[in-house]
């Protein structure tokens, strides 16, 4: 069995270089919520050195709150901003002799596109118009995945190791109790359930079906490195191969 393990990088965390030795895919911040041209270049070089698949991590323009502020923007604006960010990272990747493989929206853009077909459509169109061979990563079972499929993009359905789930398969908003899982054992058990059994237990106790093609571990978490190592060990013990 294979699984992709991804992390959001280029957001100013000191653990980025070490995480790149443990994950198979990197989602690199493109300047709208975090990072800049130099951090993008550094992350791209480190990812290439470690053989890690590179993806753009576009966001709403929200550096003050790390892309976690809800915004109401016209779909055309979201299309343009997404295309702009993908292109910026794509130029750096190309200049370093690499190939960009995927796009995964960040933060509130990701969450809103999971439920809003218009936003999902704008993002999927931007990805398709830039390069239809790119993989679109989105929340498992979301509108973003459906929009990608409509544009005939390869999609990858994502689950989260350290986030709480609602009964409908969406993530618990960060403003609500249960949004983040701080207990390492609970996060590990949840991840294995999602990957091996295709199910997740919601914060209300309801089991929900999920398709896990890639697992996100947050690089800004206090125990990100230690958890990544434990997760890799758990996968190895169960003959689950981490591969992009």
Swiss-Prot record:
Cite the InterPro entries for this sequence. Answer: Glyco_hydro/deAcase_b/a-brl, LamB/YcsF/PxpA-like
Keyword Hydrolase attributed: yes
Catalytic activity from the UniProt record: 5-oxo-L-proline + ATP + 2 H2O = L-glutamate + ADP + phosphate + H(+)
Q: Which UniProt keywords apply?
A: ATP-binding, Hydrolase, Nucleotide-binding
Q: What domain of life?
A: Bacteria
Q: Name one Pfam family in it.
A: LamB_YcsF
Q: What class of enzyme is it?
A: hydrolase
Kindly give the CDD domains that the UniProt entry links to this protein. Answer: LamB_YcsF_YbgL_like
What EC number(s) is this enzyme filed under?
Answer: 3.5.2.9
**An example molecular function term from Gene Ontology annotations:** ATP binding
One GO biological process term is:
carbohydrate metabolic process
Signal sequence extent: none
Q: Which family does it belong to?
A: Belongs to the LamB/PxpA family.
Query: What HAMAP family does UniProt report for this protein, alphabetically?
Result: PxpA (MF_00691)
- Subunit note: Forms a complex composed of PxpA, PxpB and PxpC.
Per the entry, what this protein does is:
Catalyzes the cleavage of 5-oxoproline to form L-glutamate coupled to the hydrolysis of ATP to ADP and inorganic phosphate.
Protein name according to UniProt: 5-oxoprolinase subunit A
Q: Which organism is it from?
A: Salmonella heidelberg (strain SL476)
Taxonomic classification, please? Bacteria, Pseudomonadati, Pseudomonadota, Gammaproteobacteria, Enterobacterales
